[in-house]
């Protein structure tokens, strides 16, 4: 590689040359060096004056700005933003990304159609399917179809709610109104489309998006219930059933249970979360939700690191950072994986090393390959921190560096072997090497899972091993260590990106998010984060329509 991908960011962040070994502290103007902190101070004064209770005051506690309050370049973009703008509370795009996942459920029409034809003796045709879809798109946002005197939601408040379908049968898809169809042929490259259609076959699946405002007011588990209620009512209306007849129970079962795919599984009671909450989203599902693989299919690094960014934000910033810990500092761990092109630089190095020595997906799936590739990439990453002190200051936390170096090592190993388990083994080896070199990895407890994880990479036992694609945030030992889960999701994606696979874990999930009507663009995750940081992203679920005009 010629120029380091992170050099431009370092030059923008610091006055000194990236190679300079000395700098100054305490003379930088404190929080006033930051436009965003200054804005916060002024806003805090206004809030305090209005409510009569003191609010934001950065002079309380540890003084801010003793060192450079550096901007961050969102990787793959030319956008530099302040760190505060990458906190999910301050970033509408990040909020919408999670909203669009949480409010989605996939529901089959196959069982329902069998009930209609076999129990009720009625015919199901493309025309009746289109009529049903017209009905359910009226009902899903919160409108009535079979009852009188029902209150309804304002269409403008729930404009993001709709239902589409997809099928692997081109003839059926062509007969349904295209407004309601996710066109696999249009959305995916030809080879990916053929694979996905073969997986789906003649089945017809609904992709339901309930209103953002509903999932925000309630929770993820509401999604399937809201969906099932409107689907049931729409079936009764579209196929002219009597609401109380026995077949209605079959429709309810199909819509609520039989053919329902949640984006996240139910969590144990000690975590107290239902379906479609972050802790239940498997790494392989998150990789399929991210859509980079259908537009950047010739660049496995880009594809894998877009998944890392998706997971770093969801798992680290929202799940561990707020659901689980209630803190604010977790953003700093997550941003290390998707800013300043550092992880990109390390991973492109690894990909080129693999290509030159083995060829993508051509290396033996052995520990010798793990030892070779993961060691090479780890040493490269550690050398960059030694050579460029500004890089060390950029990622000032040991856990940031450990996550980034290990992610590059894991993805690169997966590129070589076309196997996520060997990629995971490369991650753990990188952690051991890093600790040998620097004597520590991160804050106390950061490396808990890294000290014991290697023992269950290749053993698939009850609570001690799963293919990485099937693991998730609630996997044993993964549950409370920041700076891991997004990277694991990226390593899940890496072998599939190197092979050019159409999906990672579930083809239905991959297709469901290949949808141009989604508010968040899952083909360009990091670009959307940048738009959110610049306050240029327009989210759904806003309440301005029902609040006083200002």
Curated annotation (Swiss-Prot):
<feature type="binding site" description="in chain B">
    <location>
        <position position="270"/>
    </location>
    <ligand>
        <name>coenzyme B</name>
    </ligand>
</feature>
<comment type="similarity">
    <text>Belongs to the methyl-coenzyme M reductase alpha subunit family.</text>
</comment>
<comment type="pathway">
    <text>One-carbon metabolism; methyl-coenzyme M reduction; methane from methyl-coenzyme M: step 1/1.</text>
</comment>
<dbReference type="Pfam" id="PF02249">
    <property type="entry name" value="MCR_alpha"/>
</dbReference>
<feature type="binding site">
    <location>
        <position position="444"/>
    </location>
    <ligand>
        <name>coenzyme M</name>
    </ligand>
</feature>
<dbReference type="GO" id="GO:0050524">
    <property type="term" value="F:coenzyme-B sulfoethylthiotransferase activity"/>
</dbReference>
<dbReference type="InterPro" id="IPR008924">
    <property type="entry name" value="Me_CoM_Rdtase_asu/bsu_C"/>
</dbReference>
<comment type="function">
    <text>Component of the methyl-coenzyme M reductase (MCR) I that catalyzes the reductive cleavage of methyl-coenzyme M (CoM-S-CH3 or 2-(methylthio)ethanesulfonate) using coenzyme B (CoB or 7-mercaptoheptanoylthreonine phosphate) as reductant which results in the production of methane and the mixed heterodisulfide of CoB and CoM (CoM-S-S-CoB). This is the final step in methanogenesis.</text>
</comment>
<dbReference type="GO" id="GO:0046872">
    <property type="term" value="F:metal ion binding"/>
</dbReference>
<dbReference type="InterPro" id="IPR009047">
    <property type="entry name" value="Me_CoM_Rdtase_asu_C"/>
</dbReference>
<feature type="binding site" description="axial binding residue">
    <location>
        <position position="147"/>
    </location>
    <ligand>
        <name>coenzyme F430</name>
    </ligand>
</feature>
<dbReference type="InterPro" id="IPR016212">
    <property type="entry name" value="Me_CoM_Rdtase_asu"/>
</dbReference>
<protein>
    <recommendedName>
        <fullName>Methyl-coenzyme M reductase subunit alpha</fullName>
        <ecNumber>2.8.4.1</ecNumber>
    </recommendedName>
</protein>
<feature type="binding site" description="in chain A">
    <location>
        <position position="225"/>
    </location>
    <ligand>
        <name>coenzyme B</name>
    </ligand>
</feature>
<dbReference type="InterPro" id="IPR015823">
    <property type="entry name" value="Me_CoM_Rdtase_asu_N_sub2"/>
</dbReference>
<keyword id="KW-0533">Nickel</keyword>
<dbReference type="InterPro" id="IPR003183">
    <property type="entry name" value="Me_CoM_Rdtase_asu_N"/>
</dbReference>
<dbReference type="InterPro" id="IPR009024">
    <property type="entry name" value="Me_CoM_Rdtase_Fd-like_fold"/>
</dbReference>
<dbReference type="GO" id="GO:0015948">
    <property type="term" value="P:methanogenesis"/>
</dbReference>
<feature type="modified residue" description="1-thioglycine">
    <location>
        <position position="445"/>
    </location>
</feature>
<feature type="modified residue" description="(Z)-2,3-didehydroaspartate">
    <location>
        <position position="450"/>
    </location>
</feature>
<feature type="binding site" description="in chain A">
    <location>
        <begin position="256"/>
        <end position="257"/>
    </location>
    <ligand>
        <name>coenzyme B</name>
    </ligand>
</feature>
<feature type="modified residue" description="S-methylcysteine">
    <location>
        <position position="452"/>
    </location>
</feature>
<keyword id="KW-0488">Methylation</keyword>
<feature type="modified residue" description="Pros-methylhistidine">
    <location>
        <position position="257"/>
    </location>
</feature>
<keyword id="KW-0484">Methanogenesis</keyword>
<dbReference type="InterPro" id="IPR015811">
    <property type="entry name" value="Me_CoM_Rdtase_asu_N_sub1"/>
</dbReference>
<keyword id="KW-0963">Cytoplasm</keyword>
<keyword id="KW-0479">Metal-binding</keyword>
<comment type="subunit">
    <text>MCR is a hexamer of two alpha, two beta, and two gamma chains, forming a dimer of heterotrimers.</text>
</comment>
<feature type="modified residue" description="2-methylglutamine">
    <location>
        <position position="400"/>
    </location>
</feature>
<feature type="binding site">
    <location>
        <position position="333"/>
    </location>
    <ligand>
        <name>coenzyme M</name>
    </ligand>
</feature>
<dbReference type="GO" id="GO:0005737">
    <property type="term" value="C:cytoplasm"/>
</dbReference>
<dbReference type="Pfam" id="PF02745">
    <property type="entry name" value="MCR_alpha_N"/>
</dbReference>
<feature type="modified residue" description="5-methylarginine">
    <location>
        <position position="271"/>
    </location>
</feature>
<keyword id="KW-0808">Transferase</keyword>
């Amino acid at each position: 590689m010629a120029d380091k991908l992170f050099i431009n960011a370092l030059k923008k962040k610091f006055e000194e040359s990236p190679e300079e070994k000395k700098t100054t502290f305490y003379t930088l103007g404190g929080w006033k060096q930051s436009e965003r902190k200054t804005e916060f101070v002024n806003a805090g004064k206004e809030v305090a004056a209005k409510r009569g209770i003191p609010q934001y005051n950065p002079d309380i506690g540890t003084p801010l700005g003793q060192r450079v309050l550096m901007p961050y370049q969102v990787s793959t973009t030319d956008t530099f933003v302040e760190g505060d703008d990458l906190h999910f509370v301050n970033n509408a795009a990040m909020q919408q990304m999670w909203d669009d996942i949480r409010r989605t459920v996939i529901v089959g029409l196959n069982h329902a159609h069998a009930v209609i034809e076999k129990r009720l003796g009625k015919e199901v045709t493309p025309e009746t399917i289109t009529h049903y879809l017209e009905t359910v798109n009226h009902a899903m946002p919160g409108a009535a179809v079979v009852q009188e005197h029902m209150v309804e939601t304002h269409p403008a408040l729930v404009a993001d709610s709709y239902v589409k379908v997809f099928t692997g049968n081109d003839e059926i898809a062509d007969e349904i109104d295209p407004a309601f169809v996710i066109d696999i042929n249009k959305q995916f490259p030809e080879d990916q489309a053929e694979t996905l259609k073969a997986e789906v076959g003649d089945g017809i699946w609904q992709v339901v998006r309930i209103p953002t405002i509903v999932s925000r007011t309630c929770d993820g588990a509401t999604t399937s219930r809201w969906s099932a209620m409107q689907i049931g009512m729409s079936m009764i209306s579209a196929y002219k059933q009597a609401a109380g007849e026995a077949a209605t129970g079959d429709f309810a079962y199909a819509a609520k249970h039989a053919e329902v795919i949640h984006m996240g599984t139910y969590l144990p009671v000690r975590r107290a979360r239902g379906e479609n909450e972050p802790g239940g989203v498997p790494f392989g599902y998150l990789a399929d939700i991210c859509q980079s693989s259908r537009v950047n299919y010739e660049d496995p690094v880009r594809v894998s690191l877009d998944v890392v960014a998706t997971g770093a934000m969801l798992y680290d910033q929202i799940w561990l950072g707020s659901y689980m810990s209630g803190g604010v500092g977790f953003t700093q761990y997550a941003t290390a994986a998707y800013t300043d092109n550092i992880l990109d630089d390390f991973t492109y190095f690894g990909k080129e090393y693999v290509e030159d020595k083995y060829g993508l997906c051509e290396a033996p799936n052995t520990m010798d390959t793990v030892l070779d590739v993961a060691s090479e990439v780890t040493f490269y990453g550690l050398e960059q921190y030694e050579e460029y002190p500004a890089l060390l200051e950029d990622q000032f936390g040991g856990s940031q560096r450990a996550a980034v170096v290990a992610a590059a090592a894991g993805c690169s190993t997966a590129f070589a072997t076309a196997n996520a388990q060997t990629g995971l083994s490369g991650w753990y080896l990188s952690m051991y090497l890093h600790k040998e070199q620097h004597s520590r990895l991160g804050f106390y407890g950061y490396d808990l899972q890294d000290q014991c994880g290697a023992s269950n990479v290749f053993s698939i036992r009850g609570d001690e091993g799963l293919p990485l694609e099937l693991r998730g945030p609630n996997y044993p030992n993964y549950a409370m260590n920041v700076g891991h889960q997004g990277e694991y999701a990226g390593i899940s994606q890496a072998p599939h990106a190197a092979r050019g696979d159409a999906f990672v874990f579930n083809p239905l999930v991959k297709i469901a998010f290949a949808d141009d009507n989604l508010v968040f663009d899952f083909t360009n995750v990091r670009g959307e984060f940048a738009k959110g940081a610049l306050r240029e992203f327009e989210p759904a679920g806003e309440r301005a329509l029902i609040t006083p005009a200002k």
